[in-house]
From Swiss-Prot:
Homodimer. It catalyses: D-cysteine + H2O = hydrogen sulfide + pyruvate + NH4(+) + H(+). It comes from Yersinia enterocolitica serotype O:8 / biotype 1B (strain NCTC 13174 / 8081). The gene is dcyD. This is D-cysteine desulfhydrase. InterPro entries: ACCD_DCysDesulf, D-Cys_desShydrase, D_Cys_desulphydr_bac, TrpB-like_PALP, TrpB-like_PALP_sf. Gene3D superfamilies: 3.40.50.1100.
Length: 330
């Protein structure tokens, strides 16, 4: 049975539609002297786009299968995941409750009210603030219990949509990459932001089956490699088991030099990467995920960290709405 047939066994809503574009960044390639391509998951159809919609195709299908009427999730005030979950809930006629934290402890009005947070109000989300997501799985379980006691039927969507079920969305993305690149380009490396780990794990499983000679590099956005690796491997192994395939921890490569000072705080290298791609390609990155991941790609070229000189694919996971929340830093 092919990977595509195995994936088709899982309930899935069609939220993404057609494959997202895979394009060569010609001006950036000329500037860097290296072939750079981009997978445009920032232009998925709903709520200004982003990678979480792929995960929500499977998670929301499971919620409907279970008869849920409420999606419950958590994240930072400027969470792209919460924004996309809220939009899916609105599209499906479901209630959405979001447990939010302020991970950078800022009182800047733009961060607290603009960007993704503004969109949550438009999507009519019930927002519950907390001091911090120290144990998000437990905190979400407790919140779901309270919501259930009010007569609702909650479905918990994990932080980032990152569990083995949500990560199926990035096996689908790997299928798209393989189909779009076939006969056109052979990627030496793929670079992606690695945060809640589901996107990274899904790509790890999918690419190992479809493009086993391609190196996958996760640029961490919130923690050091020794903390991130177990998170990626845990989802990778659960996902591989559910699909009946083999995917080994040896395929998990992490670069952790680019997320300082902490998750959610922009840094100089990330902001420079945002500016570079905007000026050369008219494409918007974000200061939390893709800006830092692109900074890793650029520095990786400078430091000759890639294993060879072949073409590189950058996975654009979205996040541009957060730009407005980080003004005037951006």
């Amino acid at each position: 049975m092919t990977l595509q047939h195995k994936l088709a066994q899982f309930p899935r809503l069609d939220l993404v539609g057609n494959a997202t574009p895979l394009e060569k960044l010609s001006r950036l390639s000329d500037y860097l002297g290296r072939e750079i391509y981009i997978k445009r998951d920032d232009v998925t159809p709903l709520a200004l786009g982003g990678n979480k919609l792929r995960k929500l195709e499977f998670l929301a299908a499971d919620a409907l299968r279970q008869g849920a009427d409420t999606l419950v999730t958590a994240g930072a005030i400027q969470s792209n995941h919460v924004r996309q979950t809220a939009a899916v809930a609105a599209k499906l006629g479901l209630h959405c409750v979001a447990l939010l934290e302020n991970p950078i402890g800022t009182s800047q009005e733009n961060y607290l009210t603009n960007g993704n947070r503004l969109l949550l109000d438009l999507f009519n989300v019930e927002v519950v603030m907390c001091d911090g997501l120290h144990d998000p799985n437990q905190q979400l379980a407790e919140l779901a219990t309270r919501i259930e006691a009010q007569g609702f039927r909650p479905y918990v969507v994990p932080v980032g949509g990152s569990n083995a079920f949500g990560a199926l969305g990035y096996v689908q993305c790997a299928l798209e990459i393989a189909a779009q690149s076939a006969g056109n380009v052979t990627f030496s490396s793929v670079v992606v932001a690695s945060g809640s780990a589901g996107t990274h794990a899904g790509l790890a499983v999918g690419l190992q089956q479809l493009l086993p000679q391609t190196e996958l590099i996760g640029v961490t956005v919130s923690r050091k490699a020794e903390e991130q690796r177990p998170k990626v491997i845990h989802i990778q192994q659960e996902l591989a088991t559910s699909l009946g395939v083999t995917s080994g921890p040896a395929d998990i490569t992490l670069w952790d030099d680019y997320f300082a000072p902490q998750y959610g705080m922009p840094n100089e290298e990330g902001l420079a990467a945002i500016g570079l791609l905007a000026r050369l390609e008219g494409i918007l990155l974000d200061p939390v995920y893709t800006g830092k991941a692109m900074a890793g790609l650029l520095d990786g070229l400078e430091q000759k960290k890639f294993r060879d000189d072949g073409p590189i694919l950058f996975i654009h996971t979205g996040g541009a709405p957060a730009l407005f929340a980080y003004h005037p830093q951006v």
